[in-house]
Regions:
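Beta-barrel outer-membrane channel/assembly domains of diderm bacteria
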Residues: 18-116, 357, 370, 385, ...
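Transmembrane beta-barrel strands of outer-membrane/channel proteins
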Residues: 28-36, 78-84, 118-120, 170-174, ...
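Outer-membrane beta-barrel "beta-signal"
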Residues: 323-327, 359, 373, 384-399
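Residue-level signature of outer-membrane beta-barrel architecture
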Residues: 20, 24, 65-71, 108-109, ...
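Outer membrane beta-barrel
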Residues: 67-168, 173, 376
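Residues that define the transmembrane beta-barrel architecture of outer-membrane proteins
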Residues: 53-61, 97-102, 150-154, 186-190, ...
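Extracellular/periplasmic loop regions
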Residues: 97, 218, 230-334, 340-342, ...
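Repeated loop/turn-to-beta-strand initiation elements of outer-membrane beta-barrel proteins
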Residues: 72-77, 113-116, 165-168, 198-205, ...
Length: 399
């Protein structure tokens, strides 16, 4: 992978040198941060931290570079990541490093309104913050953690934009990008996507089919009702490649089902922007793949004797119904940014409080912090593994 980084960088440099009409730019961010987590000592899913091996302390250094070279018809872009981390728990300390391209793309303007592209692209869409039901690749879209880096899908795309109101894309998925597992449900899949937008509204439709995976269907939209109020929503219909069945009847065992029954997941949200440019978002999520309250209770009861399968095959969300609130400052403020988040599992009544903030120390340097405080016991989703965590860091803008 390090060779791939050097090769791509050489291609950008060579192209820029050979073509005098090419424009090249680059920027980046250097991160350094430490994280401390207090693990739950009475965890049912991870007794003694022997299964998940979660770090109690970690130190991370990360470099993120954005490279671009473009002419009138061709654009080359890459996002290169280099990381070093030291992770420690009560039993051991581990060090690791990695370098990879989280995104890269070669984009060609074929004719007016038509573009062809290939590379590793983050296929992200939809306005949801807690989760993104309309997206088969990034259900957890990373918006709850501003430090998270999404990795793109290896793909080739042809897109048509006949006017400012409409666009359509056809994408072939080769694999799920960096660190792809052999069990990749969307390998060799085809994605069709259509978008339509007006002055106050936007709508998108998505369909995806892979050879060995039932089709995924998604939709998302938003409507601006006033200068202050935005309504939005997302919808997805899918199966899960592997589903851990947890019957409410505790006398029945866990079963693992391949290609679970088709279920619908939906998110409804509203965002209100105040006169001081702060905003409040409220979201409700229903995940048809999650457990009912009785099924989740049986899940934790079975996990007492089978923690390995309970943790290893756990669904993406344990519950079916969630409430998520976000109160944040003005995103365009030059001096800093803060965000407060509250999530509640409406089935097991567990909560999670989180806060993120960053402040500008100089034109190039910012300090940031992320605190997460689950509220509940060992039989509730948010508090099943960790009692609390705190991350403190610095980031330096390059060049």
């Amino acid at each position: 992978m390090k060779l791939a980084l050097l090769t791509f960088g050489a291609c950008l440099a060579t192209t820029a040198t050979a073509q005098s009409d090419w424009l090249t730019t680059w920027d980046g961010m250097l991160y350094g941060y430490g994280k401390h987590s207090v693990l739950r000592e009475d965890s049912i899913l991870n007794p003694g931290n022997r299964l998940a091996h979660l770090p109690e302390r970690s130190a991370v250094g990360e470099l993120r570079l954005n490279l671009k070279a473009e002419s009138e018809t061709v654009r080359l872009t890459a996002r290169a990541i280099a990381t070093w981390q030291n992770r420690a728990d009560s039993a051991a300390t581990q060090q690791s490093d990695d370098a990879y391209l989280s995104q890269w793309q070669i984009r060609l303007r074929a004719t007016e309104g038509w573009h062809v592209a290939a590379g590793r692209d983050v296929l992200s869409w939809g306005p949801g913050q807690f989760r993104s039901p309309s997206n088969p690749f990034y259900f957890d879209n990373g918006r709850r953690n501003p430090m998270r880096e999404l990795v793109g899908m290896d793909s080739a795309k042809i897109s048509w934009t006949p006017d400012m109101q409409s666009s359509a894309s056809l994408v072939h998925i080769f694999s799920s990008g960096h660190s792809t597992s052999q069990d990749d449900p969307w390998r060799a899949g085809w994605l069709a996507k259509f978008d339509r937008r007006g002055d106050e509204w936007a709508l998108g439709l998505v369909a995806l089919k892979a050879p060995d995976t039932p089709a995924f269907y998604g939709a998302y939209g938003q409507n601006t009702l006033s200068d202050a109020l935005l309504l939005y929503g997302e919808l997805g219909s899918s199966t899960q490649p592997v589903a851990l069945q947890s019957p409410a009847d505790i006398s029945q065992p866990f079963t693992v089902q391949a290609n679970s029954p088709r279920r619908t997941t939906a998110l409804l949200g509203a965002a209100y922007t105040f006169e001081n440019s702060q905003s409040l978002s409220v979201e409700y999520l229903h995940d048809g793949h999650g457990y009912t309250a009785a099924q989740e209770n049986s899940y934790f009861q079975r996990a007492i004797t089978q923690p390995g399968i309970a943790l290893g095959q756990a669904p993406r969300l344990l519950g079916r119904d969630y409430l998520h609130l976000v109160w944040q400052s003005n995103l365009m403020a030059e001096t800093g940014y803060w965000r407060l988040m509250f999530s509640r599992n409406l089935n097991d009544h567990g909560n999670e409080l989180a806060s993120y903030g960053e402040t500008v120390l100089s034109p190039k340097i910012s300090a940031y912090a992320l605190a997460v405080l689950p509220q509940g016991n060992a039989r509730q989703e948010f508090s099943a593994l960790v009692q609390r965590s705190l991350t403190l860091g610095l980031k330096i803008a390059l060049p």
